Amino acid sequence: MSEIDLAYLPVIGRGEQINIICAMHGIKVNSLMSNPMGEDFNKDAQAPFGTIPWMKDHSNGIELNDSMAIVQYLVTKYEGPLTPQTPEEAAIMGMYWAWCQDYYSFVLSPFHDIITGHNEPFWRNLRLTDTLAEGGKETGIKNLTTLHKSRANLLERHLEKSGNVDQFLTGSKCSYADIFLFTCVRTTQETGGFGILRDELGRDPFED
């Protein structure tokens, strides 16, 4: 069986999609809990860019320190139900995955910083600094809720136009982009911290 080491945290984030992909493609995952929530892996000392997820493939020793690189490597290296079959299919899957990445980076990640109280300026939440300074937490939540609605509506309209609104993102076949979207949606619907988004909307964030 193919086998990788995967360093992440005990949260959904960008790492859960990798676990799901590995399960669907028959890849064994050795989970390493990274600092600041674990002691198996030190991202600041061991990861090339000081971030997680980080992955090492036992078959060839390759190490990757970017979620998109990890995802595309796994579905290409180890063929399975999520492997694109044509260049066109790969491009469309990559486009939808990039939408999820933007949504995660500019909506979910700043929300996470508010939820966990990370108000000090650092590389990941600099985009929040002005908002928090000018209006505090309440303004930050309102602005991020507005951005959530805008991004979700754009995706919904595009899917309606493409005819895929009741199927998967690329049609009748589940893609690795669907896996990332699933983890993003369930994060907003089910996790306790994102109750602030549900309360601000007064509903399920992806109800419509």
For each feature predicted by the language model, list its residue ranges.
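GST-like domain detector, emphasizing the conserved glutathione-binding G-site
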Residues: M1-E138
